[in-house]
Amino acid sequence: MELPNYSRQLLQQLYTLCKEQQFCDCTISIGTIYFRAHKLVLAAASLLFKTLLDNTDTISIDASVVSPEEFALLLEMMYTGKLPVGKHNFSKIISLADSLQMFDVAVSCKNLLTSLVNCSVQGQVVRDVSAPSSETFRKEPEKPQVEILSSEGAGEPHSSPELAATPGGPVKAETEEAAHSVSQEMSVNSPTAQESQRNAETPAETPTTAEACSPSPAVQTFSEAKKTSTEPGCERKHYQLNFLLENEGVFSDALMVTQDVLKKLEMCSEIKGPQKEMIVKCFEGEGGHSAFQRILGKVREESLDVQTVVSLLRLYQYSNPAVKTALLDRKPEDVDTVQPKGSTEEGKTLSVLLLEHKEDLIQCVTQLRPIMESLETAKEEFLTGTEKRVILNCCEGRTPKETIENLLHRMTEEKTLTAEGLVKLLQAVKTTFPNLGLLLEKLQKSATLPSTTVQPSPDDYGTELLRRYHENLSEIFTDNQILLKMISHMTSLAPGEREVMEKLVKRDSGSGGFNSLISAVLEKQTLSATAIWQLLLVVQETKTCPLDLLMEEIRREPGADAFFRAVTTPEHATLETILRHNQLILEAIQQKIEYKLFTSEEEHLAETVKEILSIPSETASPEASLRAVLSRAMEKSVPAIEICHLLCSVHKSFPGLQPVMQELAYIGVLTKEDGEKETWKVSNKFHLEANNKEDEKAAKEDSQPGEQNDQGETGSLPGQQEKEASASPDPAKKSFICKACDKSFHFYCRLKVHMKRCRVAKSKQVQCKECSETKDSKKELDKHQLEAHGAGGEPDAPKKKKKRLPVTCDLCGREFAHASGMQYHKLTEHFDEKPFSCEECGAKFAANSTLKNHLRLHTGDRPFMCKHCLMTFTQASALAYHTKKKHSEGKMYACQYCDAVFAQSIELSRHVRTHTGDKPYVCRDCGKGFRQANGLSIHLHTFHNIEDPYDCKKCRMSFPTLQDHRKHIHEVHSKEYHPCPTCGKIFSAPSMLERHVVTHVGGKPFSCGICNKAYQQLSGLWYHNRTHHPDVFAAQNHRSSKFSSLQCSSCDKTFPNTIEHKKHIKAEHADMKFHECDQCKELFPTPALLQVHVKCQHSGSQPFRCLYCAATFRFPGALQHHVTTEHFKQSETTFPCELCGELFTSQAQLDSHLESEHPKVMSTETQAAASQMAQVIQTPEPVAPTEQVITLEETQLAGSQVFVTLPDSQASQASSELVAVTVEDLLDGTVTLICGEAK
């Protein structure tokens, strides 16, 4: 029992469940959109999904690869096998299916597309013919007969006159040609038809009689074409007309809009003169199908060329896909040649026949002497000079078999020899080889068309291509700004060409900049065609415009591959030409060496060139020879331009090189000297391209980051190597010239790179400055100086950098390569400090560089550009990742289990989990594990409705709420984490928690190690260091301080650092005394600072002791934090010593401490204060010395306190009073401060 279409019904039910998100066991995320589906369906449709879903339930796809809308289409196709109704980019869907390894979907779509395109031209077409109208009879009364020819081999007879159609009825024509051509009714009982049927070898079903009716033009044309002479031209015209008739519906639909046709026709430069006027007349009446019928009538009358109509249709091939398909299906063998049935040789080109009979030619030609003699004795018009040179090069030093193979290769691949020229040569020597004459006669009878002619020069060929594809290219290039951007990125353009192109594009204010460039090539001839094609290749490479389809079609043109090779790799074309003449060049070089006409440098280069061109005769093919020459030239570091310079020098004394020079000039490498007919030089354009290529390659090899300082290796340059160029092409730029070989460069860095490789500089002898001994090279001189004098030849060479030791975070022990990295780590991980904020959106950042990266999101600035593909990025890290990922630059991370390579180590870690099965991210609710955190997030979002999960960094578990997360840390990781009891914030170190808790009790945990100033926030301490200790702050942070000024306390002058400050003190204030540390000799302006320094740095212990317990601390800020958190409540008041930071519970204890511990300091500071300003509190009468400290109520000390000294002008200054005053007393008027100048 078989259930019909049960599989389709099952898939439909699965698709219904998928849309309802029932029984779905996997999730596909694209950006923020999630698709639920069934693993089995995805795995069956895609090999990629099958591999990924084997180990996971969640797949994340980048939205740049496939958009959610496109993936929805693909998903529907997987379940239903149908593409939903609507507008879709079908080729994009095929490409996406291919990239996702949905090969069945991609192949099915491609097959469907192919069948849709070919359905109109495949199989036998059967048409119903209808009776002609009376108008037709009136128009063509002079054509009374109908002529019908049956196709040969159309089938055996199976009809009789009784089966013929009645007058006026439709007739089915079963022959293929008739089916494509006949469009009018043929009446029965025609004697002519009966005669044709009797004479045909295989008669078809035709009418037997015909009344006096006129045939259609199609019938007449078809009849004439089938029964006329066997000339190839007539048969070719018939087949070209047949092509137009086959696609009549497609072409007439494309030409439906008359105004559009006339506009395109006006722009088309390929259709000119009478042909253009003829087409315009055809569109004067009714357009559309009627206009195309009028065009077909003109073609039948031979007043309009078929190729002109095809050129008109080509203008629509990119706006009308049906026209493009029809033109692409127009095969050359069906259009240009006619091969009758029963023949295997006739109809093939002469070049194809020569290739097919290569073995016969090798057997016929047994010696080369007759060929050489015929070339020497032949008349000048026998063959062209180029063809003679090609034949001579193929014959020199080779066997007859190798010569025939090379001649055929020159004819088919390089297009430097025509088939007709080769046949002429063989005809001239056929008397010497008897069998050769019979073979040539047979081939010439079979051949129908001449083969391709000699390839024109690259510029001429490029001009012809531009003329042919001008309109298509103009439709693509409509943005002048893109053109200007691409022109600026072209490196192989000469400066003059670049300026001309930019000027032409900028002159056109609209979108016709490309038309201006084409006009400069085709009409004004102020620009070379190769420059335009170089621009097009750059545009295609950068994917700036949709140029791929058109370039693919252009590359199918005959000779296009050789042209584009010459445009993109002129050096290969140059070496290929030199290789063809290698024997002649070697002879010329050897002759000049024997006559000793070379300089020492030229002789060295000549020997190298001889070695490069000495290819053994047993080399398999010309391609292998070229590869060998390229390999040797690269190995010897001899570019093609140096060989060309050598040939220009050799040619002056060896005129026999003239054919080589002409051929090199033919491809644009050489040009004649001004005013000299037979003197050659390397063209400026080729010179520029060679320089750019060499410099880019050298700079790429030498550009290792961090290995050179800013000044570079100037020691390798003998003296100052640059000077102004007198004839620089751009007066605004300098030209740096090598003193050894006079080669000029626009950039100094390129000159430095060149100097390392300059052969002339290396060949010159250099003298040792120490002992006047001469050496052949700089390298030998360096070796001599090192051995004889114990010093290197480059005294200014940069010293090797010391290895930088890593720095360690004192809170968590993590190591960093640089101190700046550790500082950023502390700010973000430990202190949660973000001092830099965005003015646009208020976002805060820990580093200024991070803020700058963020600001580019608002400004849209993308300053980092990829040198390979010109993509731009907002961050340098994004560019670095891109160059690693897309262009394989820099360190890559390889998988030890497979061949996969990744740009970042984290990517490798994620990938390795696919091999090991490790799933470190575990869902707390259901226990499901995931290899990536993203997979866990999607799982929580999809299955548990948890928007933002909280992950534990210790055990990778996830929690839905912050409370659950904190509870987990208290229970499981209490020893590892330290939560704040007040706010619940968690810290990874006890010291971090202590500093944080102070913020709740009003303490100041961040204290200055120099002056003991304490702050509640780290940012306050930073600001204090910047303003009060700028030199120390700059030294600690390895960068110049923002507030780099140190003020003199005596004269208010400011200084950038302590050294300058000390110099100033010694010079201007010599009487001022500094306090020096006995152990480290450091100077301090006040004794209090010295005392704090000794306690903190040299005591070796923790000098600050708690008064209430046995705890000791190294810094006063830590003591203050301890006292405020352990011994006092937040409302209680402490009395800190401003000099040493010690804390006291009462003012009396503080005063006692000041008298016992800091009497000298108090005395010194009292004198300094009295010399500048008197600060007094007026009292009714002096008090006894034992009552100098005024004690106030504790309620009055609840606020901040100010300590004031009271100098006694009448008594000794040592008996000055110390008064503690609260801010409340100053505000409510209880105490009044009277300040005045000291007398």
UniProtKB/Swiss-Prot annotation:
Domain BTB: 24-87
Compositionally biased region (Polar residues): 181-199, 705-719
Entry-linked Pfam families: BTB, zf-C2H2, zf-met
Cross-link (Glycyl lysine isopeptide (Lys-Gly) (interchain with G-Cter in SUMO2)): K1066
Database matches in PROSITE patterns: BTB (PS50097), ZINC_FINGER_C2H2_1 (PS00028), ZINC_FINGER_C2H2_2 (PS50157)
GO CC terms: nucleus
Zinc finger residue extent: C2H2-type: 807-830, 836-858, 864-887, 893-915, 921-944, 950-973, 978-1000, 1006-1029, 1046-1069, 1075-1098, 1104-1127, 1135-1158
Region feature Disordered, mapped onto this chain: 130-231, 687-732, 779-801
GO MF terms held by the record: DNA binding; DNA-binding transcription factor activity, RNA polymerase II-specific; zinc ion binding
SMART domains, per database record: BTB, ZnF_C2H2
Subcellular localization, as worded in the UniProt entry: Nucleus
Coiled-coil regions listed in the entry: none
Record-level GO BP terms: bone mineralization; DNA damage response; regulation of transcription by RNA polymerase II
InterPro entries: BTB/POZ_dom, SKP1/BTB/POZ_sf, ZBTB40_BTB_POZ_dom, Znf_C2H2_sf, Znf_C2H2_type
Phosphoserine, modified sites: S190, S703
SUPFAM superfamilies: beta-beta-alpha zinc fingers, POZ domain
Domain of life: Eukaryota
Keywords: DNA-binding, Isopeptide bond, Metal-binding, Nucleus, Phosphoprotein, Repeat, Transcription, Transcription regulation, Ubl conjugation, Zinc, Zinc-finger
Keyword Transcription regulation belongs to the record: yes
Biased composition (Low complexity): 200-212
Comp. bias (Basic and acidic residues): 136-145, 687-703
Function statement: May be involved in transcriptional regulation.
Similarity annotation: Belongs to the krueppel C2H2-type zinc-finger protein family.
Name of this protein: Zinc finger and BTB domain-containing protein 40
Organism: Homo sapiens (Human)
Gene: ZBTB40
